[in-house]
Amino acid sequence: MSLATNKSILISGYGSIGRKHANILSKIFKKKNITILTKQKIKSFTTIHKLKELIKIKPNYIVISNPTGDHINKLKFIEKNYRNKIILVEKPLFSKPNKFKVKKNKCYVG
């Protein structure tokens, strides 16, 4: 039984870590509330294939599990288009030193 029925999740990236997040979160949230941003075709979750498609959904929580070099692009897009979202970014945060700061959303690195 899903506990958080009205919350929506975006998982950016569906490699091994993205899959783990999707499997764990699908035990808490309804699968229909989980969207995966990936180029892969996935039958068990809703997918979007381009970052700009993210505008169509309004996620409460965002997990960034893409390759490290792509984290900055995702964070900048989210920061530009959303407020008050909770973001989990897989470590390391960036592949090279960066002074970008998330100000409109809450960002955690793990």
Regions from the PLM with identified roles:
Residues 48-58, 101:
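Short amphipathic alpha-helix with an adjacent loop that forms part of the alpha/beta core around
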Residues 59, 64-71, 92-94:
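N-terminal glycine-rich "phosphate-gripper" loop used for MgATP/nucleotide binding
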Residues 30-32, 82-86, 105-106:
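A short helix->loop->beta-strand "cap" motif at the edges of active sites that frequently abuts
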Residues 8, 60-61, 86:
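Structural motif
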Residues 1-45, 57:
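N-terminal Rossmann-like dinucleotide-binding module
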Residues 93-110:
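A contiguous active-site-proximal alpha/beta segment in oxidoreductase catalytic domains
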Residues 69-90:
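Rossmann-fold NAD(P) dinucleotide-binding segment
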